[in-house]
Structures are given as structure tokens and as C-alpha cells.
């Protein structure tokens, strides 16, 4: 029996798929990269946006026509549960029941519908996961779930409450991977700054970054995603202490209006967010700060939108992820707040912010022209150029060869844009 896994959504889903592939391999189950060659296709799904969920249902329909056995894991599995059986799905795996996938696959041939929603995360031996999507970079999930319950967000309902992995276990995984040649690590969590709080033993993200940076062969450490009221100023201090900790912080603000922030249940004010960014920049002046903003949340008027525009102009984010609000069934906003901003208005406002951010990006990127920076070569793009990121998460494209992937190189930037930078390799460091 051959199995194919298709992954939608976030980096944590990528990591979950890597773990499941290892679990299947350990049971002697064959994996295939070709969906058409598979007997069983597992979709690791995303439900953050309605569009993401619709893509999953479309994919299920195509797989049914091909006669495939279908397994669903990820957030859609947790959200829809038994309802997925009506769509012809063979088994459903909850976000914390990853270890049940091999049993589900082996039992799929008998035609019985299966659903596993229990928490078996403690059974996973993370340090033994060898099936990674990269040969030099590894996703490392350090905390599952979220306790913040923003009114628009489905994640607390699909990923559960916050649950941290013991710090020794995480460090063991990083150590094991570093011995196998991995040099770059991204610590993952829906609210990564909450890491360790539930353990009540002094564990924190700052402590983890400090200890992981002391491991031989580790070259760079990243973390995603931060929440403003949980973010500790110890983290930028660790950035100053270790050149291995990337000077990049993704800190979603979601909106610039206090009225909308309150309706979102974001637990901070506009000014508190501004003060936090200013404090971070006092400690690490060249810190790269990116953010997320939702456009068209219920009740957003012109004044609210203008507050967001002014915030973006003031803080000058390095990157900005924009999304048009769409109600998610089961959330507080879906239940109690009318989706009253016309779609055309949402699109117009998002377009305005996109153009504003492009202008900011181009202005910020000017400081890179003629500069030499160290990057780790990641991969080759469709245009034939290779690319990598510097310590501030700036993407730089350049000519190289496949043998350079995973290597540290010095690149001189000779061209800028509102997006990636362009340059040439001046020196290979390893």
C-alpha cells in the first residue's frame, strides 16, 4: 500500500506532515510523491480561512473520482470531525492524534470509517524524525495550541489549549538534527512566546534560544509566531548576545484601531503595541519586524481603516501579510458580529495597504544596495536564480549552483526591488 501526503497551510502543518511520514516509514508503509500512484492520499488541512477549507473539499472531490482512499488530518479534521465521512473520507485524524495515522492507513482497506481525536503527542519521538523537507533547515514545533481566543480565529478550537514540549526534549531534537548536518532551525508555535508558561519550571522561549545557540553546528535560529502581550523583551536581548539568533520578529498587530482591536479580543491597545515595537528597536535597532493585518473586520469604518494606515506608516514593517476578513464558523465573530463591510470596500482597502507596503519596502531596501551580507542558500526559484535569507530575514536572489544549497555565503547586493534583493556571491564560507 502506497501513501501520498499533501500539505496545506502553515509551517506547523509542514512539520506535522514530516512527523507522520516518519511514523509511516517506521511501520514499513511505502510513501510516494505521486498522488496518482498512491492507494491512500492524506490531506493535511488548513481551516484558518474559508478559501483554504474550500480547496480541501475540492481536492477531496477529485480524489473520490480517482477511487482513492482519503484521510484528513489538520484543522479541517478537527473542525468537521465525523461530517467528513459524508464526503467519502475514510479516516479523520485530529491535530494531536498524529501517532494514529499508521493504524488508520492499515485499516483503511477494510472500508471501516475511522476517527481519532485523542491527544497522543507525548508518544512522538521528535528527535528520530528524519523525513524533513530540507537538508539543512528544520521546523521544530515547541508548543501546540493557543489560549488567546481572538474572536475571528478558529485555531484555539482546532489546535486546542497551549501545551509546551519539555525544553530538554526540544534541545535533544536540535542536537540530533545538527549532528545530521542541519544548521538552521525554526521554532514553531501558534503562540510561540507562550512557550514554557504551562510547564511552570522557568522554561521560556528566550531560554530555549540561548541554550540552542550553544549547540555545535547550529548556525541560525528563527521563531514563529509571536503574540504582543506574551512577547518578552528578553528575546531581543538574546539576539544581541548571539549572532545565531535571527534578528527577525513576526509580531502580528491585526489592526490599528483600538475599537477593532477590542472587538477582535486582542488584549492590547494600539499605543501598547507601538510602545512594544519601540522597546524592541531600542534594544536591537536593526531588528526586522513583520506583521499581519486583517482588513474589513466587522464594524471597520473609514476612521478605523485610516488608523491602520497611519500605524503602518509609523512603524514601517519589513513585511506585511494582509488578509480580507472572512467569518469562520464556530468563532465568536461569526456568531455575534455582522460581516457588514462590503467585499468591494475590503478589497479596495487591502489594495491600498499593499501599495503602501510596497513603497515602504522599496525605501527600506535602499539601505542594502552595495552591501555585503551573509546568507544561507535555501533553494532554486522558478526563474533559475537561487535565493537565501540574511539574519534579518531579507530574501536575496543570486546565481549559484545546486551544490551551494545549505551553504553559508557572502552576497553583495547590486539591485533592489519592493520584494527580493538581487546580488552576486562574493565568498563561500563553508
Curated annotation (Swiss-Prot):
Gene3D superfamilies, alphabetized: Methylthiotransferase, N-terminal domain, tm_1862 like domain
Entry's cofactor comment: Binds 2 [4Fe-4S] clusters. One cluster is coordinated with 3 cysteines and an exchangeable S-adenosyl-L-methionine.
Domain of life the protein comes from: Bacteria
Cofactors named for this entry: [4Fe-4S] cluster
InterPro entries in the cross-refs: Elp3/MiaA/NifB-like_rSAM, Methylthiotransferase, Methylthiotransferase_CS, Methylthiotransferase_N, Methylthiotransferase_N_sf, MiaB_methiolase, rSAM, rSAM_horseshoe
Cellular-component GO terms for this entry: cytosol
GO MF terms held by the record: 4 iron, 4 sulfur cluster binding; metal ion binding; N6-isopentenyladenosine methylthiotransferase activity
Span of domain MTTase N-terminal: 1-110
Chain sites annotated for binding [4Fe-4S] cluster 2: 146, 150, 153
Binding site for [4Fe-4S] cluster 1: 10, 46, 75
Subcellular location: Cytoplasm
Catalytic activities: N(6)-dimethylallyladenosine(37) in tRNA + (sulfur carrier)-SH + AH2 + 2 S-adenosyl-L-methionine = 2-methylsulfanyl-N(6)-dimethylallyladenosine(37) in tRNA + (sulfur carrier)-H + 5'-deoxyadenosine + L-methionine + A + S-adenosyl-L-homocysteine + 2 H(+)
Domain TRAM: 366-427
Keywords tagged on the record: 4Fe-4S, Cytoplasm, Iron, Iron-sulfur, Metal-binding, S-adenosyl-L-methionine, Transferase, tRNA processing
SMART domains linked to this entry: Elp3
Oligomer and partners: Monomer.
Biological role stated in the UniProt entry: Catalyzes the methylthiolation of N6-(dimethylallyl)adenosine (i(6)A), leading to the formation of 2-methylthio-N6-(dimethylallyl)adenosine (ms(2)i(6)A) at position 37 in tRNAs that read codons beginning with uridine.
Family: Belongs to the methylthiotransferase family. MiaB subfamily.
Name recorded for this polypeptide: tRNA-2-methylthio-N(6)-dimethylallyladenosine synthase
Organism: Fervidobacterium nodosum (strain ATCC 35602 / DSM 5306 / Rt17-B1)
Amino acid at each position: 500500500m502506497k501513501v501520498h501526503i499533501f500539505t496545506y497551510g502553515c509551517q506547523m502543518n509542514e512539520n506535522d506532515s514530516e512527523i507522520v511520514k516518519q511514523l509511516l516509514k517506521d511501520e514499513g508503509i511505502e510513501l510516494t510523491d505521486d498522488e496518482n500512484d498512491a492507494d491512500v492520499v492524506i490531506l493535511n488541512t488548513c481551516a484558518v480561512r474559508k478559501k483554504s477549507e474550500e480547496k480541501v473539499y475540492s481536492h477531496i472531490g477529485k480524489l473520490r473520482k480517482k477511487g482513492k482512499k482519503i484521510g484528513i488530518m489538520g484543522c479541517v479534521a478537527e473542525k468537521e470531525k465525523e461530517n467528513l465521512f459524508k464526503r467519502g473520507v475514510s479516516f479523520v485524524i485530529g491535530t494531536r492524534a498524529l501517532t494514529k495515522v499508521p493504524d488508520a492507513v492499515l485499516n483503511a482497506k477494510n472500508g471501516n470509517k475511522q476517527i481519532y481525536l485523542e491527544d497522543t503527542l507525548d508518544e512522538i519521538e521528535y528527535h528520530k524524525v528524519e523525513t524533513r523537507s530540507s537538508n539543512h533547515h528544520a521546523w521544530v514545533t515547541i508548543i501546540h495550541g493557543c489560549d488567546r481566543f481572538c474572536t475571528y480565529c478558529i485555531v484555539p478550537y482546532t489546535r486546542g489549549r497551549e501545551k509546551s514540549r519539555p525544553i530538554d526534549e526540544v534541545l535533544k531534537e536540535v542536537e540530533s538534527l545538527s549532528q545530521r548536518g542541519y544548521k538552521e532551525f525554526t521554532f514553531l508555535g501558534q503562540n510561540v512566546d507562550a512557550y514554557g508558561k504551562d510547564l511552570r519550571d522557568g522554561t521560556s522561549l528566550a531560554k530555549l534560544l540561548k541554550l540552542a545557540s550553544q549547540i555545535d553546528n547550529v548556525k541560525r535560529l528563527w521563531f514563529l509566531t509571536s503574540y504582543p502581550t506574551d512577547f518578552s523583551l528578553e528575546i531581543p536581548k538574546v539576539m544581541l548576545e548571539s549572532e545565531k539568533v535571527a534578528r527577525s520578529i513576526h509580531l502580528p498587530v491585526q489592526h490599528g484601531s483600538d475599537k477593532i482591536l477590542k472587538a477582535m479580543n486582542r488584549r492590547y491597545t494600539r499605543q501598547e503595541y507601538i510602545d512594544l515595537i519601540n522597546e524592541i528597536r531600542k534594544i536591537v535597532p536593526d531588528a526586522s519586524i513583520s506583521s499581519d493585518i486583517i482588513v474589513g473586520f466587522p464594524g471597520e469604518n473609514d476612521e478605523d481603516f485610516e488608523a491602520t494606515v497611519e500605524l503602518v506608516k509609523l512603524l514601517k514593517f519589513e513585511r506585511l501579510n494582509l488578509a480580507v476578513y472572512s467569518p469562520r464558523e464556530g468563532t465568536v465573530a461569526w456568531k455575534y458580529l455582522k460581516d457588514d463591510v462590503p467585499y468591494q470596500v475590503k478589497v479596495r482597502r487591502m489594495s491600498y495597504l499593499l501599495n503602501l507596503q510596497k513603497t515602504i519596502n522599496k525605501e527600506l531596501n535602499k539601505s542594502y544596495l552595495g552591501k555585503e551580507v551573509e546568507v544561507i542558500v535555501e533553494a532554486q526559484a522558478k526563474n533559475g536564480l537561487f535565493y537565501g535569507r540574511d539574519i534579518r530575514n531579507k530574501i536575496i536572489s543570486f546565481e549559484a549552483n545546486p551544490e551551494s544549497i545549505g551553504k553559508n555565503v557572502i552576497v553583495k547586493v547590486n539591485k533592489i526591488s519592493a520584494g527580493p534583493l538581487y546580488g552576486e556571491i562574493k565568498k563561500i564560507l563553508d
